[in-house]
Amino acid sequence: MTDAREKGFWTGPLEMADPELHALICGEVERQKKTINLIASENYAHQSAMEACGSVLTNKYSEGRVGERYYGGTHWVDRIELLCQKRALELFGLDPDVWGVNVQPYSGSPANFAIYTAVVPPGGRIMGLDLPSGGHLTHGYKTKTRKISASSVYFDSRPYTVGSNGLIDYEGLEKTFTDFLPHILICGYSAYSRDIDYKRLQSIAGRNGAFLFADISHISPLVASGLMNSPFEHCDIVMTTTQKGLRGPRGALIFYRRAVTKNGETVDLDARINFAVFPMLQGGPHNHTIAGIASALLHAGTPEFAEYTRRVVENSRELCSRLQSLGLDILTGGTDNHMLLVDLRSTGVDGAAVEHMCDALGISLNRNAIVGNSSPLSPSGIRVGTYAVTARGFGPEEMREVGDIIGGVVKLCREMTGGRKMSKADLHRVTSDARVMGSEQVLVLRRRVCALAEAYPIYE
């Protein structure tokens, strides 16, 4: 019989087996090394988590729950999943007799849909923060003319908003809730820089026995470290992704009270949540990812990680202060977490122009809709986060330098555009123009970016 090894069945290292793909990955490695990453939803995963994700665990199917699998040979992956669950509950100080956690969701969006599927009837009512106000797509986003997210297609969604100051309008929220009477009230946001009054939201949700669900994907490390209010005291269900502040692989955790009482009836959330994840929406869990999450959760429970989260907030506030000193407007006037939203309307440039020019200079951030914008595709703001740069080692001094660079980019964009909105093609032409990119103003900014990136290397 022919030896499969002789035919390359086992392929060998990526560099040898697929040099084309290897070269592309190496290109991304170099980009990450040379780029200042200010995207609020990104971070640098722990090397141990990446090692687990590249392990033989990817070979194993294990549909079902621990002890209730549909496959044999799950002894080791069962132990890994139990370890991940244990560490997740411990990180937030949760009593396992009161709280359960499902660690199988592939990422945050399907986790959210699983939650709705578990507790909201088909066509039932969900209520979350509007996307231009800082909510997430999966919280029921739709426009006046089109349903965008599946959460607005399969459920009846109605948004609440922030006020003109950028803060959640709790009075308006309460009025909308009373008019709409949703089955689930969603809090926790993707572009909101302030803390959340979970107690007040619990009081509102209790009016008709609605479930209160917190999506803390952006702020879960800050909650775990005690730097932000905890939703666990007041919410029925809590979800977080694992790749942002937790520095794990892409996945999600759904925490749920094992049983809750709604309108006089006991609801078995343990059964509902787990059944919604599997078999309703998913098949076999990604065991390699669960192992990577378990490793990240171990790190997240250390004093060193608590210090990291403290520095994340410190850096965010330092950057906020610097940008304000340069005359830039910050939505809500400040920040309580890892992100800030810069309102560019007074500068004469939009978020797309700043994002595009920053990208050309080696800074990653994203355009972001702010209150009053009609479309997230043509926003008036940018969202800036400090998880990744803090993991890299940046401190207050470096954040002031980052703020000065962003201020320089805004000034450059204003000079380039003359206050007019530019199309994506126009922006591409500008950043491809050797005269523009070779100007002294641009070269100085690029050198400053390179100096910061070189001073704080990654994965060495």
UniProtKB/Swiss-Prot annotation:
Which cofactor is recorded for it? pyridoxal 5'-phosphate
The record's Gene Ontology cellular component field reads:
mitochondrion
Q: Which reaction does it catalyse?
A: (6R)-5,10-methylene-5,6,7,8-tetrahydrofolate + glycine + H2O = (6S)-5,6,7,8-tetrahydrofolate + L-serine
Q: Which CDD domains match?
A: SHMT
User: What SUPFAM superfamilies does this protein's entry cite?
Assistant: PLP-dependent transferases
UniProt-annotated location(s) = Cytoplasm
Superkingdom as given in the UniProt entry: Eukaryota
In terms of Pfam families, this protein maps to: SHMT
**Which InterPro entries does this UniProt record tie to the protein?**
PyrdxlP-dep_Trfase (IPR015424), PyrdxlP-dep_Trfase_major (IPR015421), PyrdxlP-dep_Trfase_small (IPR015422), Ser_HO-MeTrfase (IPR001085), Ser_HO-MeTrfase-like (IPR049943), Ser_HO-MeTrfase_PLP_BS (IPR019798), SHMT-like_dom (IPR039429)
Q: What sort of enzyme, by top EC class, is this?
A: transferase
Q: Which GO terms describe its molecular function?
A: glycine hydroxymethyltransferase activity; pyridoxal phosphate binding
- Which PROSITE patterns does the entry mention? SHMT
* Pathway of action: One-carbon metabolism; tetrahydrofolate interconversion
Description of how the protein assembles with itself and partners: Homotetramer.
| Function per UniProt | Interconversion of serine and glycine.
Name of the protein described by the UniProt record: Serine hydroxymethyltransferase, cytosolic
What organism is listed for this UniProt entry? Encephalitozoon cuniculi (strain GB-M1) (Microsporidian parasite)
